[in-house]
Regions:
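Phosphate/NTP-binding elements of NTP-utilizing enzymes
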Residues: 2-194
Length: 194
């Protein structure tokens, strides 16, 4: 029986037995404790010039990840093209892999933008070593579920985007482009869920 998820050799299906070496265990624990180390060593991104490359972070990106890890609420007002979305995605992946039963929402001004961010996260996940991956329960363009119970969904920002759920992390991308009347309704419906 195959140990890959739906024929994708880069994804481990749920309930796959893995033999951990002592080195794997120590590395897993180090990554769990240090999301910056995890991102530097294991996150892969697509570069326009070089294709798939390691995520070589700047100091401000490391600081962002540490702030996310140490503080429940974060607001970042930053310029374009600074790698902030990639930085956020690397932290969200860390959070989902190393914490059981967490719910994460990736929301953006357009569903396609949120799905693109989820796609970046999925690409990074596919490039993790199999011993670090959680098995896959479901995997598509709008959501994924890992065997540790963690779930990530991608939607457009609206007052009903996350209604009916409880979320450990809500990542709002391009929030400045959300009309005020939608933003107000969104916060009224979302704030009780976090």
């Amino acid at each position: 029986m195959s140990e890959v998820y739906l024929g994708n050799p880069n994804l481990k299906k749920a309930n796959t037995q893995i033999e951990f070496t002592q080195e794997n265990i120590l590395e897993f624990l180090k990554c769990k404790d240090d999301p910056v180390y995890f991102a530097r060593k294991y996150i892969k991104i697509v570069s326009l010039d070089s294709g798939l490359v390691p995520f070589n972070m700047y100091k401000f990106q490391e600081k962002l990840i540490r702030n996310f890890h140490e503080n429940r609420f974060n607001i970042c007002k930053m310029p374009r093209q600074t790698g902030k979305s990639t930085t956020c995605v690397s932290y969200l992946l860390h959070y989902a892999v190393f914490n059981d039963n967490v719910n994460i929402a990736i929301l953006a001004n357009k569903a396609s933008t949120a799905q693109d961010l989820l796609g970046r996260l999925q690409l990074a996940y596919e490039n993790l070593p199999s011993w670090m991956q959680q098995g896959i329960i479901s995997w598509n363009k709008r959501s994924l579920e890992l065997e540790n119970g963690s779930k990530i969904s991608a939607n457009s920002t609206s007052s009903s985007a996350v209604r009916g759920g409880s979320y450990n992390v809500i990542f709002l991308d391009e929030f400045a482009f959300i009309p005020n009347h939608i933003a107000d309704d969104f916060f009224a419906s979302v704030y009780p869920t976090i």
